[in-house]
Curated annotation (Swiss-Prot):
It catalyses: 1-(2-carboxyphenylamino)-1-deoxy-D-ribulose 5-phosphate + H(+) = (1S,2R)-1-C-(indol-3-yl)glycerol 3-phosphate + CO2 + H2O. One of its GO terms (biological process) is L-tryptophan biosynthetic process. Keywords: Amino-acid biosynthesis, Aromatic amino acid biosynthesis, Decarboxylase, Lyase, Tryptophan biosynthesis. Its EC number is 4.1.1.48. This is Indole-3-glycerol phosphate synthase. GO terms for molecular function: indole-3-glycerol-phosphate synthase activity; phosphoribosylanthranilate isomerase activity. SUPFAM superfamilies: Ribulose-phoshate binding barrel. It comes from Pseudomonas aeruginosa (strain UCBPP-PA14). The keyword Transcription does not apply. Pathway: Amino-acid biosynthesis; L-tryptophan biosynthesis; L-tryptophan from chorismate: step 4/5. It is an enzyme of class 4 (lyase). NCBIfam families: PRK00278.1-2 (NF001370), PRK00278.1-6 (NF001373), PRK00278.2-4 (NF001377).
Length: 278
């Protein structure tokens, strides 16, 4: 397994961070907090229901910064962004909680989830079951597993931990080898295809289109990175890909939710889906 250099650096720091967190709050206490957290909102179901109707199932990302682009949004208020996304028609939220490389925080996830009725995925680099239980404790409804960061044994262990605490799993792949490993190891219905090459950082929507034929029909494909305009959306939809994870394009907009609505819904007669809280 060839792990990109940037990812190696992130994972090394993540191992230190998990050890620090465990020293501050032991697993038993995190498990207690997880048991008392609000019930999960059904992340996978929210996406599947939209996709079955052939409607855009958008996971809208709340991300302050990235290692390659620096700060994406100076005026960064997670609750405000979450409400904007909900009004714009998002199906789910993705919130970055990695501190050192993405300027994220657990508090951002809590604030975003409290401000809306949408399910939330904790976007972080998961390498330890402790983080999975912690995700449930801070209110996440789903966790992300990045295949390029994990071996098959650990990937299966993390997915089993997620299931045990009621979390959905979004597995992320970048190429055919990772896809094969994910399908062999996990039974999650959510398969994310990241169109960004982690070695070169180049983005190509062809990555999703190339891998599509290898994915069983009972899995929902989520295309990640590189969706910038209506033509990109239509390219995916004509290939029957209806689930999208979009972050940077929204974060750079004055009104993230309005940009979401413009990109995915405006040419459909302005119908906004899921804008009314349950």
């Amino acid at each position: 397994m060839s792990v990109p250099t940037v990812l190696q650096k992130i994972l090394a720091r993540k191992a230190e961070e998990v050890a620090e967190r465990r020293a501050r709050v032991n697993l038993a206490e995190v498990e207690r907090l997880a048991r008392s957290a609000d019930a999960p909102r059904g992340f996978a179901n929210a996406l599947l229901e939209r996709a079955k109707r052939k409607e855009p199932a958008v996971i809208a990302e709340i991300k302050k910064a990235s290692p390659s682009k620096g700060v994406l949004r100076e005026h960064f208020v997670p609750a405000e962004i979450a409400r904007s996304y909900e009004a714009g028609g998002a199906a789910c939220l993705s919130v970055l909680t990695d501190v050192d490389f993405f300027q994220g925080a657990d508090a951002y996830l809590k604030e975003a989830r409290a401000a809306c009725a949408l399910p939330v995925v904790r976007k972080d680099f998961m390498i330890d079951p402790y983080q999975i239980v912690e995700a449930r404790a801070i209110g996440a409804d789903c966790i992300l597993l990045i295949v390029s960061a994990l071996d098959d044994v650990l990937m299966a262990e993390l997915a089993a931990t997620a299931k045990s605490v009621g979390l959905d799993v979004l597995v992320e792949v970048h190429d055919g080898t990772e896809l094969e490993r994910a399908l062999k190891t996990l039974d999650t219905p959510l398969v994310g295809i990241n169109n960004r090459n982690l070695h070169t950082f180049e983005v190509s929507l062809e990555t999703t289109l190339d891998l599509l034929p290898e994915i069983p029909r009972d899995r929902l494909v989520v295309t990640e990175s590189g969706i910038l305009n209506r033509a990109d959306v239509e390219l995916m939809e004509v290939s029957e890909v209806y689930a999208f994870l979009v972050g940077e394009a929204f974060m750079r907009a004055d009104d993230p939710g309005l940009e979401l609505k413009r990109l995915f819904f405006q040419e459909r007669g302005g119908v906004v889906l899921g804008a009314d809280p349950d």
